[in-house]
Amino acid sequence: MISLEDIRRDYLLGGLDLDQLDASPIAQFETWMAQAIESQIPDPTAMVLATANKDGFPSQRIVLLKKLDEQGFVFFTNYGSRKAQEIAEQSHVSLHFPWHMMERQVSVGGVASKISYAETLKYFVSRPKDSQIAAWASAQSKPISSRQLLLQQFNAIKTKFANGEVPLPDFWGGYRVVPQRMEFWQGGGARLHDRFVYEREGNSWAINRLAP
């Protein structure tokens, strides 16, 4: 079995203090996201989405953050997917942004719900046409016999909509995660990392430092 216990490194890129934080976790996240984009780290909008079914059994996958606003975090998916089915059963979810190259991570706990048709449509029409076609071609999370069959379905849809716009599927759309708790983590020397948690208190947020 491969040995893992000696794989480690020091965290040297700097600390995080309370007076550096915005009063709003959304504003603080926007600052960190802008810095992640500017740093040209790979896939800065990639986030781990954790859901659970009605029995509490969890699942995770990486999805892309496609919109950030004052209300929360928006992603898109097939409504028949496992994640969508689990959100329908139990709407509490968790997001995680692992920005390893910046020695940072952000965790978000909140409630997911579908966004409006108009909001979904606005995003869908902005997608590349092949991505629009892929939304139609894939019955996400369902068993499929081969990749060849998937490509056949894709090509059939592509032919169908070759001379016109691709309509928005009624089985595809967006979710917004409204945060109730957000944690910002900055790596520190000697494993003395800096952690700050925002917790919603009515219309405001309480901020506390956590032990690493």
Curated annotation (Swiss-Prot):
Substrate binds at R8, R9, D10, Y11, K66, Y123, R127, S131, R191, L192, H193. Binds 1 FMN per subunit. Keywords: Flavoprotein, FMN, Oxidoreductase, Pyridoxine biosynthesis. Its EC number is 1.4.3.5. One of its GO terms (molecular function) is pyridoxamine phosphate oxidase activity. It catalyses: pyridoxamine 5'-phosphate + O2 + H2O = pyridoxal 5'-phosphate + H2O2 + NH4(+); pyridoxine 5'-phosphate + O2 = pyridoxal 5'-phosphate + H2O2. Pathway: Cofactor metabolism; pyridoxal 5'-phosphate salvage; pyridoxal 5'-phosphate from pyridoxamine 5'-phosphate: step 1/1; Cofactor metabolism; pyridoxal 5'-phosphate salvage; pyridoxal 5'-phosphate from pyridoxine 5'-phosphate: step 1/1. The keyword Flavoprotein applies. Pfam families: PNP_phzG_C, PNPOx_N. FMN binds at residues 61-66, 76-77, 82-83, 105, 140-141, 185, 195. Catalyzes the oxidation of either pyridoxine 5'-phosphate (PNP) or pyridoxamine 5'-phosphate (PMP) into pyridoxal 5'-phosphate (PLP). This is Pyridoxine/pyridoxamine 5'-phosphate oxidase. It comes from Saccharophagus degradans (strain 2-40 / ATCC 43961 / DSM 17024). The gene is pdxH.
